[in-house]
Amino acid sequence: MMNPLVIKLGGVLLDSEEALERLFTALVTYREKHERPLVIMHGGGCLVDELMKRLALPVVKKNGLRVTPADQIDIITGALAGTANKTLLAWAVKHQINAVGLCLADGNTVTVTLLDAELGHVGKAQPGSAALVQTLLAAGYMPIISSIGITVEGQLMNVNADQAATALAATLGADLILLSDVSGILDGKGQRIAEMTAQKAEQLIAQGIITDGMVVKVNAALDAARSLGRPVDIASWRHSEQLPALFNGVPIGTRISV
């Protein structure tokens, strides 16, 4: 079997029917022409923010990571492993893609430990066992995996989806694409940077050009490139006509290498 490709979905993708239609059409196009197995990894930050607002609960972030108190983890699990995961599964069904909805803990695919007590139920992701996902891929299924994990003590954990995707790609020996709202990393003038190294990223973070959630995204991509020993792509799902080429290794956003 060819090396799988992990596609991490982020941004407002889950909120936009048009975006989901474009993405799944691109997935179908790719799967028709290529043998390479695909694995979808997702978070659902926008969905969680919306739910928090409806329930009048505060959203607190620390260094771009969501603080998850004990009284919110059940709600976040429901939003990510429930609504977000099954929404994506529904789109797969609609496009005749055989898919399976999972979380990080299924088959111990990604191991999760407590990241920082101050962040509450926020987990640190590390590579786990590839057995379950490889079995599904060999049988022709496309796994759709949420960023909810479980510690060995049985605690539910919210994991940053970029970091979860990195651990998943490491588990599977897979390439990784981080799909989001932006067409890659932008310079001070809003222009896309095609190639990015760790040195260049540190420079742009120090200059305040890369900020907030994008710092987490860039660091996740750099961590991924380091641990996987191969470049990682950050790209936008908005350019749907270019997605099959991206899935086939053509850089359309920012390619990050160490």
Swiss-Prot record:
GO terms for molecular function: acetylglutamate kinase activity; ATP binding. InterPro entries: AceGlu_kinase-like_sf (IPR036393), AcgluKinase_fam (IPR004662), ArgB (IPR037528), Asp/Glu/Uridylate_kinase (IPR001048), NAGK-NC (IPR041731). GO terms for biological process: arginine biosynthetic process via ornithine; L-arginine biosynthetic process. It is found in: Cytoplasm. Its EC number is 2.7.2.8. It catalyses: N-acetyl-L-glutamate + ATP = N-acetyl-L-glutamyl 5-phosphate + ADP. Pathway: Amino-acid biosynthesis; L-arginine biosynthesis; N(2)-acetyl-L-ornithine from L-glutamate: step 2/4. SUPFAM superfamilies: Carbamate kinase-like. Substrate binds at G44, G45, R66, N158. Keywords: Amino-acid biosynthesis, Arginine biosynthesis, ATP-binding, Cytoplasm, Kinase, Nucleotide-binding, Transferase. Its main location: cytoplasm. ATP binds at D181, V182, S183, G184, I185, L186, I209, I210, T211. The record marks K8, K217 as: Transition state stabilizer. Belongs to the acetylglutamate kinase family. ArgB subfamily. Catalyzes the ATP-dependent phosphorylation of N-acetyl-L-glutamate. Homodimer. This is Acetylglutamate kinase.
